[in-house]
């Protein structure tokens, strides 16, 4: 299967990520879920957590972003993830990701 879906992660200050991908998993309010090309159109609220982007195959994710929550618009050909904060944690260790997650939670708790 050579089909892909365009994935864009959008923050108020920039487009944090934009690329064709095989699959994306993200943190919905009811738990993690995955999206493949030709997915049924939907809009989903997202909670803070990890977005994993599978560029080359659906068995290994190549890009990981920590997001602050938000909303995603899904169509059969694209995924737009709109979030206040998106941190590229692709090359970080599990402990570094935990630290980033903690710092993000502190930031979000001070905003509300």
From Swiss-Prot:
Keyword Transcription regulation attached: no
Domain of life from the UniProt record: Bacteria
Membrane topology label: Peripheral membrane protein
Glycoprotein listed as a keyword: no
UniProt KW keywords: ATP synthesis, Cell inner membrane, Cell membrane, CF(1), Hydrogen ion transport, Ion transport, Membrane, Transport
A Pfam family per the record: ATP-synt_DE_N
Gene Ontology molecular function: ATP binding; proton-transporting ATP synthase activity, rotational mechanism
TM spans (from-to): none
A cellular component term, taken from the record's GO annotations: proton-transporting ATP synthase complex
Annotated localization: Cell inner membrane
Signal peptide: none
UniProt similarity note: Belongs to the ATPase epsilon chain family.
Role this protein plays: Produces ATP from ADP in the presence of a proton gradient across the membrane.
Description of how the protein assembles with itself and partners: F-type ATPases have 2 components, CF(1) - the catalytic core - and CF(0) - the membrane proton channel. CF(1) has five subunits: alpha(3), beta(3), gamma(1), delta(1), epsilon(1). CF(0) has three main subunits: a, b and c.
Protein name, UniProt field: ATP synthase epsilon chain
Source organism (scientific name): Rickettsia prowazekii (strain Madrid E)
Name of the coding gene: atpC
């Amino acid at each position: 299967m050579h089909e892909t879906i365009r994935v864009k992660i959008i923050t108020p200050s920039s487009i944090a990520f934009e690329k064709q991908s095989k699959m994306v998993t993200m943190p919905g309010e009811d738990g993690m879920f995955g999206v493949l090309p030709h997915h049924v159109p939907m809009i989903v609220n997202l909670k803070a957590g990890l977005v994993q982007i599978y560029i080359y195959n659906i068995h290994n994710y190549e890009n990981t972003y920590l997001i602050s929550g938000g909303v995603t618009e899904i169509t059969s050909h694209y995924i737009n993830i709109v979030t206040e904060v998106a941190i590229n944690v692709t090359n970080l260790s599990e402990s570094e990701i935990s630290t980033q997650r903690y710092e993000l939670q502190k930031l979000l708790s001070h905003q509300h």
